[in-house]
């Protein structure tokens, strides 16, 4: 897996463009996509390209880190792919974190931007009041207008590589401070390939499978392993 996540995504788009990529079942009691949501690979690629343009135009690039607080919404996955395409690391925020824990994460990862929902804006602002850094914020529903301009140039010169940082995942912090785990593009794709190659009851037929994963996208299982397992095989999560 000597490629970037964007390269892997584009390869699957070319092979399985009309196949479903992300799906959310209908649920009238849920606060979003009550009627359900589904997007195929080709349309997802178009959505990702639009996000890439917004991030790039605002000056975000290789080596920046964006804290993402979108809970388990499919938009999280689209933003992650867009961020990674530019060499930006995706730093998911556990929605159950208390303000002090969020403050630690934002300060420790040196976030360059916070992408959030309207519903979690207050907790994020409370967290921001506990640190000395001023991190720009953008509500997801307003992202089409573009995020605030980056406060510093892209830290890394040169193209995105398989060794570039793709995600920075934080542990639950139950026994101490949450610990940040750096995952490269190569690591994430290899994790997905491992999942796709398990076989047996877990055999994934290219372009034919769906996985229902109720686990949180800030966790490595749903956000990385099964996500890239399906992406690499043209499946749907």
Where are these regions (language model features)?
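A short helix-loop-beta submotif of the ANL/AMP-binding
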Residues: 65, 71-91, 95-99, 108-113, ...
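Conserved AMP-binding A3 loop
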Residues: 37-42, 166-193
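Conserved AMP-binding/adenylate-forming core of the ANL superfamily
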Residues: 22-73, 77-81, 98-103
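A short N-terminal helical cap/helix-turn-helix that marks the beginning
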Residues: 1-27, 46, 166
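Conserved AMP-binding/adenylation subdomain of ANL enzymes
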Residues: 189-210, 218-237
């Amino acid at each position: 897996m000597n490629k970037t996540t964007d390269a892997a995504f584009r390869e699957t788009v070319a092979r399985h463009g009309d196949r479903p990529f992300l799906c959310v079942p209908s649920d009238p009691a849920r606060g979003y996509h009550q009627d359900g949501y589904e997007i195929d690979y080709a349309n997802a690629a178009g959505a990702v390209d639009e996000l890439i343009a917004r991030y790039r135009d605002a000056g975000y690039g290789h080596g920046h880190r964006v804290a993402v607080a979108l809970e388990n919404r499919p938009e999280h996955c689209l933003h992650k792919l867009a961020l990674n395409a530019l060499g930006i690391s995706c730093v998911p925020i556990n929605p159950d974190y208390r303000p002090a824990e969020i403050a630690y994460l934002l300060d420790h990862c040196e976030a360059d931007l916070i992408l959030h929902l309207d519903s979690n804006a207050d907790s994020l602002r409370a967290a921001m009041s506990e640190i000395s850094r001023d991190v720009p914020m953008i509500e997801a529903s307003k992202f089409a207008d573009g995020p605030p301009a980056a406060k510093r140039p892209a830290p890394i010169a040169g193209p995105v590589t398989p060794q570039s940082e793709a995600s920075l995942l934080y542990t639950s912090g139950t026994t101490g401070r949450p610990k940040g785990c750096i995952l490269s593009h190569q690591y994430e794709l290899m994790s997905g390939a491992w999942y796709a190659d398990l076989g047996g009851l877990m055999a994934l037929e290219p372009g034919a499978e769906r996985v229902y994963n109720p686990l949180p996208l800030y966790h490595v299982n749903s956000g990385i392993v099964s996500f890239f397992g399906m992406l690499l095989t043209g499946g749907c999560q």
